[in-house]
Curated annotation (Swiss-Prot):
EC number: 7.4.2.8
Organism: Streptococcus pyogenes serotype M5 (strain Manfredo)
Signal sequence coordinates: none
Intracellular or extracellular location(s): Cell membrane; Cytoplasm
Domain of life: Bacteria
PROSITE patterns xref list: SECA, SECA_MOTOR_DEAD
CDD domains tied to this protein: DEXDc_SecA (cd17928), SF2_C_secA (cd18803)
Annotated protein name in UniProt: Protein translocase subunit SecA
Biased amino acid composition, Basic residues: 827-839
Length: 839
């Protein structure tokens, strides 16, 4: 272990020596740049662009370009990047993560690699965790970029598509991580090229990269459309039922936060819903509602997992930042179950039209880099998932903060008494204090206790995060007491007020350890910026969530020996700190495994999504007749239909092929079984294809010009692709839930998901081509079709998709359940295109 640690340290030192060498070269240009006039310095941007066009690489331009930005920052902002900031900028340009402590000037550090990469003209995205930071950084640092002749855009959720397009077309675009992701998904749902807003993804520099790429990695971005639902009463009934249960009627597994009915609970459910057997197959839907109601009532906690807004909306609370996640909903009906629990309006369930995880979203950039003060603990994940190294950057001044040993109390009550007493003592002498909590509930509790103690303070949590930047900015003033949920206000520096250094600087008090060491380090890092004095102190109790769920037997045995009889007894031990860290490592390992599994599943969809989106983009951007593509689909559809009956009785095969041709290709009277008998399969395929081509030409002749033909072809393909893709996403989601159970049968769920997902994708492609063929051949096309197509193109909304899906099923001829499907798939009608009708 010691050898491994030594090797890691030596590697870091070697990397720092390389960075320092390049940084010195950047510094060597300082006098030269300082001697230039404003006009000459500004002219360097055009010079760099020309040199890049002539073949110089960005790496060759780096020393001089970084020097230009340093001088520009000095003239425009009055700030001159230190050597350690230059080193951080080099790491960012290389597509890695410089670990820079709080207050070391990460925002200024980013200006150098952002400027350099913008020279290539392919766009640079600076990603922040909220719109306040996007707007702030774009406004402040944008002055430097604009002065140097680069355009800067801010992408906000409220902007129109035209405004977003303008922002993305700038050299540098500031945006939140969620908005970039949603814009990508929406771009792949439009039916006209002019409605797209993004350019190809080039370089992303992510601020607070651990928050975006690690903490939010488990939460997919989902674009969904409403699906009419009559199930609200079931949510309410299930909620009413579980509220009648006592603690013996359900079983909770605390470490995994799962819950299920006990035997007595099952008996009560069967009695309540008048069932003979709750787990009969026809009751599967009901058990799903009951499971969600159990989770909502006994696992999901108000003010910890979610809050209820003033207008009665359930808002998810991000467990890592303490902020509410606007627009996000718990999936799989859990959100509706919580709405039933809290007695607010139950919103309709939705059907996913497009989704992507942050992991796969950001891996699509040509180059990805990020900044944070705390990433070393997640180094393995950054390397394996994103191919990014973590390079710790030295501080410009030595850290003067004192980190005190953790204090452990027997109960929550005794711990909070000690916290209030500590705050009272420090506040009396004027020392500013930041109290960090992991939940809104704890913030409110401590706030009430401080009010009782007569201590004025500010509370910063998920309920008032609009004021968070202002509150955090004042947290370093003399006598200030601030309670902050987790890492609320992250990204805003706490600067010490006058006379505070002499009082010991800002004191950070942690009210419990978070399950992630990184979050604890972030809280500590709010104090002691740029060599300022400061202190940190964590208070723990045996009743803390982390200690209850993951406290080891060694801790319990140690505490038994200490005989904690007195409620206010406190333990201060290095061994305790090591055991807590060990528990945190276990949790981090569990969370990493979960994120890894999410990625493995999403990688299956990623490959399929990229194929669909690439083909979609080809259709949207095509300014030509798409006839060759449609004819190829027709040919493959005919081939599949004929091949599906190759092994059947010859008479039955011919009859089935004729049925397929009449329902999907040609007018009913234009083909008969008689003319196909005696022909070989290849001859039948060719005959049907030639007939289909004649019909195809007849159909297009009804459109008045080439422009109308191209528009009709595009809308036809895109509408069908979008319908089938939406259905496929839903099917993959159901498959994922189903294969999860196969782990109990010693089968690898991910491998099964990959295999079955691939087969389903092939089936979907066949279904797309069949629907394009049938619609092309059978559609009633009139002269005004172009106007109708154009109108449909501007309203490609999920509700249109729903009606289109219904229309497709209704167009099928009357076929009995167990007959072969006329699409030629070889499946029974009830298992193919008839599935939706019968369901």
């Amino acid at each position: 272990m010691a050898n491994i640690l030594r090797k890691v340290i030596e590697n870091d030192k070697g990397e720092l020596r390389k960075l320092e060498k390049i940084a010195k070269k950047v510094e060597s240009y300082a006098d030269q740049m300082a001697s230039l006039s404003d006009r000459d310095l500004q002219g360097k941007t055009l010079e760099f662009k020309e040199r890049y066009q002539k073949g110089e690489t960005l790496e060759q331009l780096l020393p001089e370009a970084f020097a230009v930005v340093r001088e520009a920052a000095k003239r425009v902002l009055g700030l001159f990047p230190y050597r350690v900031q230059i080193m951080g900028g080099i790491v960012l340009h290389n597509g890695d993560v410089p670990e820079m402590r709080t207050g070391e000037g990460k925002t200024l550090t980013a200006t150098m690699p952002v400027y350099l990469n913008a020279i290539a003209g392919e766009g640079v995205h600076v990603i922040t965790v909220n719109e306040y930071l996007s707007t702030r950084d774009a406004t402040e640092m944008g002055e430097v970029y604009s002065w140097l002749g680069l355009s800067v855009g801010i992408n906000l959720a409220a902007k129109s598509p035209a405004e977003k397009r303008e922002a993305y077309n700038c050299d540098i675009t500031y945006s939140t991580n969620s908005e970039v992701g949603f814009d990508y998904l929406r771009d792949n749902m439009v039916v006209r090229q002019e409605d797209m807003v993004q350019r190809p993804l080039n370089f992303a520099l992510v601020d607070e990269v651990d928050s975006v790429l690690i903490d939010e990695a488990r939460t997919p971005l989902i674009v969904s459309g409403a699906v009419s639902s009559e199930t609200n009463q079931l949510y309410i009934r299930a909620d009413m039922f579980v509220k009648t249960l006592t603690s013996v009627d359900y079983v909770i597994d605390v470490p995994t936060k799962t819950i299920g009915l006990s035997d007595s609970g099952i008996d009560k459910a069967e009695s309540y819903f008048n069932l003979s057997n709750l787990y009969d197959i026809e009751n599967v839907a009901l058990t799903h509602f009951i499971d969600n109601a159990l989770r909502a009532n006994y696992i999901m906690l108000l003010d910890i997992d979610y809050v209820v807004s003033e207008d009665g909306e359930i808002l998810i609370v991000d467990q890592f930042t303490g902020r509410t996640m606007e627009g996000r909903r718990f999936s799989d009906g859990l959100h509706q179950a919580i709405e039933a629990k809290e007695g607010v309006r139950i919103q309709e369930e939705s059907k996913t039209s497009a989704s992507i995880t942050y992991q796969n979203m950001f891996r699509m950039y040509k180059k990805l880099a990020g900044m944070t003060g705390t990433a070393k603990t997640e180094e393995e994940e950054f390397r394996e998932v994103y191919n990014m190294r973590i390079i710790p950057i030295p501080t410009n001044r030595p850290i003067a903060r004192i980190d005190h040993t953790d204090l452990l109390y027997p109960t929550l009550e005794s711990k909070f008494r000690a916290v209030v007493e500590d705050v009272k003592t420090r506040h009396a002498k004027g020392q500013p204090i930041l109290v960090g909590t992991v939940a809104v509930e704890t913030s409110d509790l401590i706030s009430r206790k401080l009010v009782e103690a007569g201590i004025p303070h500010e509370v910063l949590n998920a309920k008032n995060h609009f004021k968070e930047a202002q509150i955090i900015m004042n947290a370093g003033q003399r006598g200030a007491v601030t309670i902050a949920t987790n890492m609320a206000g992250r990204g805003t520096d706490i600067k010490l007020g006058e006379g505070v250094r002499e009082l010991g600087g800002l004191c950070v008090i942690g009210t419990e350890r978070h399950e992630s060491r990184r979050i604890d380090n972030q809280l500590r890092g709010r104090s002691g910026r740029q060599g300022d004095p400061g202190e940190s102190q964590f208070y723990l109790s045996l009743e803390d969530d982390l200690m209850r769920r993951f406290g080891s037997d060694r801790i319990k045995a140690f505490l038994d020996r200490m005989k904690l009889d007195e409620e206010d007894t406190v333990i201060k031990s290095g061994m305790l700190g090591r055991q807590v860290e060990s528990a945190q490592k276990r949790v981090e390992g569990n969370n990493y495994d979960t994120r890894k599994q999410v990625l493995q599943y999403d990688d299956v969809m990623r490959e399929q999504r990229e194929i669909i989106y690439a083909n979609r983009r080809d259709v949207i951007t095509a300014n030509r007749d798409l006839g060759p593509e449609i004819k190829a689909m027709i040919k493959r559809t005919i081939d599949r239909a004929v091949d599906a009956h190759a092994r059947s009785n010859r008479k039955d095969a011919v009859d089935a092929i004729v049925t397929f041709a009449r329902t999907s290709l040609v007018p009913e009277e234009s083909i008969s079984a008689k003319e196909l008998r005696g022909l070989k399969d290849e001859q039948i395929k060719e005959k049907l294809y030639q007939r289909a081509l004649a019909i195809y030409d007849q159909q297009l002749s009804k459109l008045r010009d080439q422009e109308a033909i191209i528009e009709f072809q595009k809308v036809l393909i895109l509408m069908i692709v979008d319908n089938k893709w939406t259905e496929h996403i839903d099917a993959l989601d159901q498959l994922r839930n189903a294969v999860g159970l196969r782990g109990y049968a010693q089968n690898n769920p991910v491998v099964e998901y990959q295999a079955e997902g691939f087969k389903m994708f092939q089936d979907m492609i066949g279904a797309i081509e069949f629907d394009v063929t049938r619609t092309m051949m059978k559609a009633q096309i009139h002269e005004q079709e172009r106007e109708r197509a154009s109108q449909r193109a501007t309203t490609a909304a999920p509700q249109n998709i729903q009606s289109q899906q219904s229309a497709n099923t209704d167009d099928l001829p009357k076929v009995e359940r167990n007959e072969a499907c006329p699409c030629g798939s070889g499946k029974k009608f009830k298992n193919c295109h008839g599935r939706k009708s019968f369901s």
